Amino acid sequence: MVSETKTTEAPGLRRELKARHLTMIAIGGSIGTGLFVASGATISQAGPGGALLSYMLIGLMVYFLMTSLGELAAYMPVSGSFATYGQNYVEEGFGFALGWNYWYNWAVTIAVDLVAAQLVMSWWFPDTPGWIWSALFLGVIFLLNYISVRGFGEAEYWFSLIKVTTVIVFIIVGVLMIIGIFKGAQPAGWSNWTIGEAPFAGGFAAMIGVAMIVGFSFQGTELIGIAAGESEDPAKNIPRAVRQVFWRILLFYVFAILIISLIIPYTDPSLLRNDVKDISVSPFTLVFQHAGLLSAAAVMNAVILTAVLSAGNSGMYASTRMLYTLACDGKAPRIFAKLSRGGVPRNALYATTVIAGLCFLTSMFGNQTVYLWLLNTSGMTGFIAWLGIAISHYRFRRGYVLQGHDINDLPYRSGFFPLGPIFAFILCLIITLGQNYEAFLKDTIDWGGVAATYIGIPLFLIIWFGYKLIKGTHFVRYSEMKFPQNDKK
């Protein structure tokens, strides 16, 4: 039998996120250290053409995923997002595993952001103990989420605005350098696409390897689905925000990568260094310095600190809301379903803060091996969440139509069904399974490295099938699916 799914809009959450908040979450959600720091490594490994093609391909995949999520979130705007859709339209245990894995992923990611924050601050204050900065930033992130959802929304709006402004200025400076208007700048142009093995250095294998990095860079775009549960007029604002995704991908990622590749040759050894500790070799910093802007390192340090805080702020919000929704559905202790007068799930916030703090402490005072395994177990979760979105949307639309509902009644309709979710699922699956494909091409396989890379997959399957075995659930048939908005009519 199919257990009764109790997932509805969680009572008590305040719909205080306005259209401008959602738009900035959609635009700035995935602009972070992946673009500001790690993008140089993609050009170095795959060449300018290979990196650009990888960003365009993964960007197309993410666009399809966001249109799928947009259709689901506009129709059923709940904070459980894809975990809710997974249990309603795929299988209850599937949604259970998606929810717990996503909460755990962000709790660990907050700890990673705390480590990154202290590394960034050490650039300015090398003699100050790093844990002081991490504790300070954890306190700031906690307070932004403690007061109200509007506090999170406002902080994320301004964080994202800083990141977006930086990318726009970067693109303008880059274009001026390329066309020769920026006086005193080092020469730039298409010559960097013809040196050595460019434009496709390393061939197809290098592009596959780069796709992994690019995929991680885009993670965070799905946050808009969770924010839908506290959005004003989600049927109107969610589609508007989702439509921004295509232009964000085109402008902020593709144009930025193109400009970097035209100004800095892929053979520049600085591009391979992608440690947030050394801002001076960020590809953005290198381009600004090529333009004669010698203070670029200090500016980019501040921007990257903003990106780290933004990631931590978003992670705290996402994990808190996911834990709250799990509790409302009876899939986590009920204590986490309690709300403050302002509509904030503070018990869930306390728990997430404690877990994130403990994970951080393992990196500081505990066994580094423990910390690395915690990090590795969460590494796959973003890709698993994307797979869950594609599967849930495909089955949602199929069930919706088979039950006789008119797709024109949907608040937002993905225009590429079924090709969009199918393409996104296949490509995301290839990226997920190909994370460490090089290990299997060597004479001796490093099984420890393989286990560290893929541990997130069996962990997800154990949670899923463990729940399925205990509860006796099965895949939801199309005829059994519930469509609450239509049922209300």
Curated annotation (Swiss-Prot):
Membrane topology per record: Multi-pass membrane protein
NCBIfam families: PRK10836.1
Keywords attached to this entry: Amino-acid transport, Cell inner membrane, Cell membrane, Membrane, Transmembrane, Transmembrane helix, Transport
Gene coding for it: lysP
Stretches that traverse the bilayer: 23-43, 46-66, 106-126, 129-149, 162-182, 198-218, 245-265, 291-311, 347-367, 371-391, 414-434, 447-467
Marked site positions, Essential for the stimulus-dependent interaction with CadC: 275, 278
Reaction(s) catalysed by this chain's protein: L-lysine(out) + H(+)(out) = L-lysine(in) + H(+)(in)
Function statement: Permease involved in lysine uptake. In addition, functions as a lysine sensor that mediates the lysine-dependent regulation of the transcriptional activator CadC. In the absence of lysine, or at low lysine concentrations, LysP inhibits CadC by an interaction with the transmembrane domain of CadC. In the presence of lysine, LysP loses its ability to interact with and inhibit CadC, and acts as a lysine permease.
This protein's record includes keyword Transmembrane helix: yes
Subunit structure: Interacts strongly with the transcriptional activator CadC in the absence of lysine or at low lysine concentrations. Interaction is markedly attenuated under increasing lysine levels. Concomitant pH-dependent protonation of periplasmic amino acids in both proteins dissolves their electrostatic connections resulting in further destabilization of the CadC/LysP interaction. Low pH promotes oligomerization of LysP.
Gene induction: Expression is repressed by high external lysine concentrations. The HTH-type transcriptional regulator ArgP is the main regulator of lysP transcription. Under lysine-limiting growth conditions, ArgP functions as a transcriptional activator by binding directly to the lysP promoter region. In the presence of lysine, Lys-loaded ArgP may prevent expression of the gene. In addition, expression is activated by the global regulator Lrp under lysine-limiting conditions. Expression is not affected by pH.
Residue ranges that the UniProt entry lists as topological domain Cytoplasmic: 2-22, 67-105, 150-161, 219-244, 312-346, 392-413, 468-489
Cellular localization per UniProt: Cell inner membrane
Annotated GO CC locations: membrane; plasma membrane
A Gene Ontology BP annotation from the UniProt entry: L-lysine import across plasma membrane
UniProt organism field: Escherichia coli (strain K12)
Protein name, UniProt field: Lysine-specific permease LysP
Main location: membrane
Residue runs in coiled coils: none
